[in-house]
Each structure stands twice: as structure tokens, then as C-alpha cells.
Amino acid sequence: MPAMRGLLAPQNTFLDTIATRFDGTHSNFVLGNAQVAGLFPVVYCSDGFCDLTGFSRAEVMQRGCACSFLYGPDTSELVRQQIRKALDEHKEFKAELILYRKSGLPFWCLLDVIPIKNEKGEVALFLVSHKDISETKNRGGPDNWKERGGGRRRYGRAGSKGFNANRRRSRAVLYHLSGHLQKQPKGKHKLNKGVFGEKPNLPEYKVAAIRKSPFILLHCGALRATWDGFILLATLYVAVTVPYSVCVSTAREPSAARGPPSVCDLAVEVLFILDIVLNFRTTFVSKSGQVVFAPKSICLHYVTTWFLLDVIAALPFDLLHAFKVNVYVGAHLLKTVRLLRLLRLLPRLDRYSQYSAVVLTLLMAVFALLAHWVACVWFYIGQQEIENSESELPEIGWLQELARRLETPYYLVSRSPDGGNSSGQSENCSSSGGGSEANGTGLELLGGPSLRSAYITSLYFALSSLTSVGFGNVSANTDTEKIFSICTMLIGALMHAVVFGNVTAIIQRMYARRFLYHSRTRDLRDYIRIHRIPKPLKQRMLEYFQATWAVNNGIDTTELLQSLPDELRADIAMHLHKEVLQLPLFEAASRGCLRALSLALRPAFCTPGEYLIHQGDALQALYFVCSGSMEVLKGGTVLAILGKGDLIGCELPQREQVVKANADVKGLTYCVLQCLQLAGLHESLALYPEFAPRFSRGLRGELSYNLGAGGVSAEVDTSSLSGDNTLMSTLEEKETDGEQGHTISPAPADEPSSPLLSPGCTSSSSAAKLLSPRRTAPRPRLGGRGRPSRAGVLKPEAGPSAHPRTLDGLQLPPMPWNVPPDLSPRVVDGIEDGCGSDQHKFSFRVGQSGPECSSSPSPGTESGLLTVPLVPSEARNTDTLDKLRQAVTELSEQVLQMREGLQSLRQAVQLILVPQGEGQCPRVSGEGPCPATASGLLQPLRVDTGASSYCLQPPAGSVLSGTWPHPRPGHPPPLMAPWPWGPPASQSSPWPRATALWTSTSDSEPPGSGDLCSEPSTPASPPPPEEGARTGTPAPVSQAEATSTGEPPPGSGGRALPWDPHSLEMVLIGCHGPGSVQWTQEEGTGV
């Protein structure tokens, strides 16, 4: 398995630090969120606190960290206020008070509130520790329970206040002195810290940076990699020179001293000594995959692993010889121990084994090194055969055979007294070291091949034996040589398979797991390179892959267990997930139920900074934290901190329900989790229904944090849409580009009906509500359901006639006060700014009076009324309620602006429509003078529809309360002001019964298309449509046409309607019929 780099991602180890540092007396603590002012909810609760108070973790979470649920009648009110003040001011506080367990038993508690800051220096958490000091208080007698809190007033006696206060003060002093005396054996330095007021360092709630000394080397850093390269070269040098110097040495006497060492030998020994020093300052990877930076742990780990081997390999034989210390050949053989350093190179070289060229190079180097060792041994065997031969001149060894072929035979000479020889052939291998004594006869063996020829011949034999069976030119003759040749051939067969057969099945089986790791790593790197993944995301991907590989070693357990039978697979799953199945939540489950649940459990892994669950995600599993710590966030606020043994998720929903997460869950450290899939959980509970109620009840108490609170989407209830008076709720969405989300569909051109009914039609109640600007509408109901249409509008299932449709949003531009008002009425509906033909506007047309329009059309798509989009099912959540409140507020502001604009418009019209005296009124054809004061009255009403303009035409002969003169002979009747202001049409038809027409001046509309009466029969002809449209002068209508409709004469009685000054609509006067309304004059205006 390749050496891992270790997990170097920065982690938030706050929870682990608290658990290890605050043990013993400080293990009973809770953590409160200091960012939620006023409540300071508990985000973590230790097991010791639960054991002390009797409350479970689920009962303590999200309560106030002041732990007011532990208060009782004897709890001091003053201490309560001081605790609250310390929390509000983010200050440290310590006090003694009486608290009560869940069972009701009181106990004395030493409470300590410690604020904890984050990386920004802000107080993020409160550490509230609780220490039970009841035993200390009980030593003073039973009256000590009554000295504080409510008992102080309950049992106090008059005149004893000073005595009780002194006694309490003395006991407090004794208690603190006893505490200091107990701490004295721990060391004087701690006492000095207490005297000078130095406080213990508290951990901060932040991502812990990698803190290491500058003298600590990272095992995978560039500096350490460079140093390892030098050590690799030195080790290879030792692997080559040590066997050669031991086997090819020509020293014959044990007392002979070695020659001076070379510079390379001295440099290698210095490097080995320095490597020992650096190994004491180099990080390592622990069994859990974490990188250890502590110097003490590093030293302990090195001493127990490679220290002894490195010390033996670094014995300075050459340095001792350099300092004139006599080192013999026997001691020099200990240098062969340095070859064991090659074992240390294997893990370091294994990280490069994923590259084929590197693997081939390393294998060839190993093969050549092995051949060098075999050659050295083969040379040593041949020389020993010559020295130990019984004859004076042995001739059966491979060295004698080589000497005869090279014509450099061996010969014997007598040893001289000074140890020299008379031949002087120092270049031969037998004479280079001074020769050797033959059989102890005083003769010395000299001659033979040179040392270079002998080594090359040995290396040739070694390679031929390792790669094949040899060629026979260099063969084994003696028994010793034959035995070594056999061993060499066996080693050669194995090495041949390893080196030259690495693509075969044997090599693949040997490196199957390694190849799988490298192939997946290579695929991952190729994917990153092809898709140009950014560097931070690339690092996260590699970290996650390496961390998960370290956990499961690349084994796909799901695929592996699929081939096993269900019975065996269930037993294996119960063994793997026994930590989760031993929770109290599953105590009542039968063995069969546990086996079914174990098959639904899946392992999961989360790295630091990774989000396990995002807010709004559909919850699909329950998660049990096996190791590590996580935090629950919502809008950057920490809601809970989860550690080992915590269960997160939601309450058991129905199968059809989808639960959305109400917060984010992020890993602080490397976390190993077990997730229970909700789908598998439902299937298991369906098989064992007797366990389902117990599991549902127990799950509420076991959840450390409920992620599904308020996140269940309810089913649709369409029965709420059946009422006639039910209005659909609308939601105004704010678009960033400023475009309207919904528009109003116009009425089709071939429809006889329109949103504004003709005078002959009877308005329905729903249409009247839509037409009145100040209608009183019921409060819209949330959660309306319907079928969505393609236009983004939900059609109610109860039918189109059941619900009137309104605008999606109403927006009014502000009206400036310093410019003349536009007296032409406009329909302000929030979409009037669009002037293209694709924008839908209101269509005001007067339909044909008659029985065919006696009833108003139902509000729907065909009638052209406004469409109300239905709110989707998620409108019941909190976000939708906030948006709806905002939309209602904005709509109210726009309605107020519209009311102010209408009042200004009404005042301006009242100033224009004042009573006029007798005067000449111009004809429609434009002949004759016209008073300037009448120009404003002659302007027709214009309604902007985006397509064509419409003008209002009064009937001929109608007068305005007798103020206008009667028509003279030969002249057309004068034009009257056709519009006063009256009550809204919500109490009656939209327009009184009159013969006025809405006629279009557009060229595209044929003449008379919008008229209800025939063409005028008087000699005076109206101006052409183009002139009328340009000048804005309405066409005249004859008296005959006015009376041909069968309308009663003006002045007939009618019912009066209530006046609404805030709701103004345009109506026609002067042509009252029997069924029309008799309008009353307003005092002071003549209208």
C-alpha cells in the first residue's frame, strides 16, 4: 500500500479540545450560542452534565444555557440576575448556588461561565460548567443549605445578619485555601501562575491552523523530499561499495589494518548521522491518518521504530580511521548492516510506483544490484577455494581456469622476512594485498588474473545465471561453486519473472490493490485536468478520495456483499453497524427487525468544511456520528455542535411526505457517520409494524437536533377551493431585472362580453367587486391549490367561475405636484409602461344592449378578467408568509398613492366643470368661435389600451342643467360636458342607461364596430375619423337617434345611490331612461 500523505486539511477541533482539557471536575458543561441574544440556546451538552442533572440531551438542547430549568425555590434570585447580566455583557462569571436535579433533589453547584471567542475576536459560545460541591458544603452542617438563596430569608433570624455573613465569608476562605493546598504538590510553577493571575488558555471556536515549530519538517514537504534524495544516493552507494569492500578485500591477516577511507565514505557517514537528527524533527502519519506535529510524539515514534537500525548503520568506522583509530577488518564487516536501510526506501519509493517508467527503472536497478551482490560472492568463493586448496597449485577453481585462459598462472614464492615478495607483481589479484600463505608452508601464492578481470568475469557469470542457465564458459567446478550456482539460478528465475514479466498475471495479482488505487487516482487526475477543476476543489477531491480509501481500502462493500446470501449479509451488517444498533432507540426491536434495519445502514464520510446537508434539501436519511464533530448552521449562526454518539435527522415522516432541512450541517473534523436511509427504514417498519410506534416516540427523544422542524410539506386539500367567495392568494415576486412576472390576458376580439359591461347588462357580484376600486374583499387564504398552466398561472380545480382573478402586483408611479395633471383617465394597473402590441391592457367596450347580455360573464380566461396566480404548496412556510406580508404592505402603499391621485384628479375636474353662462358653442364640424373655457370640456375621455383610442360621444340635445343654450335652427346642437363624477358602479351597472357610445378613432377598426345605434340621419355629417382622432372632437349625434333607442325623457325619477368620494367613475348625464339612475347635484359645483 502506498504511503499516505496524511490528512492535512484544517479542522475545527474545539469539541475535542474541550473534551480532553476540561475533564474531571469540568466534564459537566454545556455550550451556549452567544450570537442569539436573550436566549443563548444550548448547542452542546456533555454526558457528565446529563448524569449530574438527570436530563437527557434532547431535553437540554435549544434551552437557555443559563439552565433556568435547574432553578428551584432555594436558588438565589441575586445569583440568577448576575448570571443573566454576565451572559448579556459577555463576561466571565463564577458563583455558588443551589440547583435542582430532574428528580427534584437539590445540590450545591459551583457554576462557571466562560466566554469563548472565534477567529474574529467575537464571543461565539459560552462554556457553562457545573461542579457538584454538595459534599464540601455538607461538612459545615445541615444549616449550610439555608444560608443562600431563598433559604437565607426563610430561615434567617433577626440580629444575626453580621454573624451569618462572617461565617459564610470564613467558609469561603477555607474552601479556597483548601483548594490551593490540594494543588501545591503539582508544582511551584502552577502556584506562581495562580499568584500572578495568569489564567489557563481556553480554546477558540475556529478552524485550527496547522501549528508547528519552524524546526519541524513536514514528511511530505519539498525540503524533506530533497533530503530523501540525498539519502537515496548515499544508500545506493553503500549498497554497492560495502559488498565489494568486504568480499574483494585481499587482506590475509586479521591484524592487518585497512587503508585510508575515501571522501565519499566520510560524506556518507556524515549524512547518515544528520539523518538521525532530522528524523527526530520530522512529522509522521498516525494510524488514524492524522499528521502528528508534536515533538514529543515524533521522538517516541522514531525511537520505537527505526532508531536502532539507523544507529547501527551510521557507526562511523571511516571517521574513526580518519582520526587515527585502528579499525580492523572484522569490525568493518558491521557495515553490511547499512544494507537494511534499503527497507526504509521502499515506502518512499512506493509513491512513485504509479508511473510505469519509474517502476521499470527501479526494477532494473534492483536486478543490477542483485547481480553485483552475486558477483561479489562468486569472486569471494573462488578466492577461498584457492587459499584452502590441499595441493600447492590448485587447478580446479574458476579462478585457475580464468588464469590459464588469460595466461596469467599462479605460482608459489617463499615469504621474505620483512613480509614482502621477490616477484613484485602487484597488479595481480593474489599479490595486490601481499599474497597468502599456502597451506601454512611458508610459501606465498602469487600471480593469477587481475582484479578488474576477475570482477568482470564474476559479474558476467552472475548475469548469465540470473537471466538463463549460463553458457558454460565460466562454470562451477567445486562443490561450493555448484551449490552457489544452483541458488543463483533459482534467484534468477524469480527475478526474471518479476522484471521481465511484470505485465503478466502474477505481477497483476501481486499489485492488484495498488493498481486499483493508482488507476482511480489517475482517473481522478485526468478528470480534473479535462474539466479544468479549480485548485481548491481539486484539493478537496483528492483529500476525500485519500481519506475514504484509508477507511475502506478501496473495497466496495455493497458490491462485495451482493454475492452473499441475505442471511449472511444481514449478520455481517449487524456486526459492522453494532454501534448504531446498540442505541436505546432500538432496544425494543426484535432481532429480525434489527437485521432488516442493518441492511438499510450505509457508511458515510465527511471532511472538514464539507456540507453534509444544505438548508432546503430533502432529508433522506438519519445520520449517526461515529467519530469527529460537526456543527449545525442557519444563516451563519451555530445552532448545535454534534459529536460522537449524536443522532441528527428528522422525526419519522409519512411515506408521501417530503421533509426539507431547516439548517446546514457542516463537518468540523474528519467525520465517520452511519446513515439510515428513510426508504429502507419505512420498508423495515412496514415488516414490523409493532415496533413503528415505539420507534417514532423514541426518535423524538434521541435526536440531538431535529432538522425537520417545520419542514414537512403537507398534502393538498382541494376542497378549500370550492367556495364562491374564496380568493386565491397572490405573491409578488421581486425580479432583479425589473420585468413584470405576470401580465393580464386581453379579452378576445370575437368575444361579445368585456370586463366592463354595457349599460344594458346586469353586473354580477363578482364582477362588481372587481370593478369597484374600494371593494371590501375577504382576506386571501394561504395554500390555495390548483393546476398550473403554461403561462405561470394556476387554474383552480373548482372551475373558472368560482374565483375571480386579480393582478399579480400593483405598482403606481409617484405623481409630481408641480406639473399640470393629466386629466385623461388612465388605467393604472402596474403594466401601463409597456407600449408594444405584446403588452396586454384593459379593453373598455360598450356591448350591444339586449337580452343576450342580460347576465355577466363568469370571471375566467374567456371573460378577460384578471388572473390570480395560485401560490404553490410551499406557501405555508415561513419564507412565503414573509413575502406575502411584504407584498400586502407594498400594495397598501400603492392604494394610498392611487387615492391621493384620484383626489387630485377630482379637484382638477371640479375646477373645470364649473357652471358656464350663455355663449356660443361651436359645432362639431369646427365652424364658429368657441370659448376658451370650453376647450377643456371638449376633450374626450381617452383610455390607453395600447392599440386604439376611444372617444365618448354624448347624445344630441342633452343639456347640462339648463346652462347651455338651446340649439338654433340651421345649426347642430351644442356639445355638452358628457361626464360628471358619481358613485361607483359597484352598487349598480357600470354605466347608467344612456345612448352615449364608445367609438374607436383607430383606422384599423371599421366604422360602427363599437356602436350600439345606427349612423346619424341629420344633414350635418361628422368629421372624418382621422380628423376626429387628431383633434379629439367627438362626432355629433342627432336627436332622432337619441330618441330612437326608446329611452324615457330626462328627469324621470330613479333611486339614489350612496356617495363614495374615494371611488370615482365616469357616467353620462342628460339622457335618463326609465331604468337609469337620477343623479343629484353637488352643492357649490353645479355637477
Curated annotation (Swiss-Prot):
Q: Which Pfam families does the protein's record reference?
A: cNMP_binding, Ion_trans, PAS_9
Please list the residue ranges that the record places on the Cytoplasmic side of the membrane: 1-228, 281-302, 353-361, 504-1087
Which regions are flagged for Basic and acidic residues bias? 137-150
Q: Where in the cell is it found?
A: Cell membrane
Q: Where is this region: Disordered?
A: 137-161, 416-436, 733-813, 975-1061
PAC domain mapped to chain residues: 93-145
Membrane is among the record's keywords: yes
Please list the residue ranges that the record marks as compositionally biased, kind Basic residues. 776-788
Keyword Transmembrane helix found: yes
Say where the protein is mainly found: membrane
**Which residue positions carry a glycan here?**
N421, N428, N439
UniProt intramembrane stretches: 457-477
Q: Tell me the GO molecular function terms.
A: inward rectifier potassium channel activity; voltage-gated potassium channel activity
Q: Which Gene Ontology BP annotations are present?
A: potassium ion transmembrane transport; potassium ion transport; regulation of membrane potential
List membrane-spanning regions: 229-249, 260-280, 303-323, 332-352, 362-382, 483-503
Ranges for domain PAS come to 18-90
Tissues in which the UniProt entry reports expression: Highly expressed in adult and embryonic brain, in particular in cerebellum, brain stem, hippocampus, cortex and striatum. Also found in pituitary.
Concerning NCBIfam families, the annotation shows: sensory_box
Q: What does this protein do?
A: Pore-forming (alpha) subunit of a voltage-gated inwardly rectifying potassium channel. Charactherized by a fast rate of activation during depolarization followed by a rapid inactivation at much more depolarized value causing inward rectification due to a C-type inactivation mechanism. Exhibits a rapid recovery from inactivation.
Q: Which family is this sequence assigned to? A: Belongs to the potassium channel family. H (Eag) (TC 1.A.1.20) subfamily. Kv12.2/KCNH3 sub-subfamily.
The protein here is known as Voltage-gated inwardly rectifying potassium channel KCNH3
| Species of provenance | Rattus norvegicus (Rat)
Gene responsible for this protein? Kcnh3
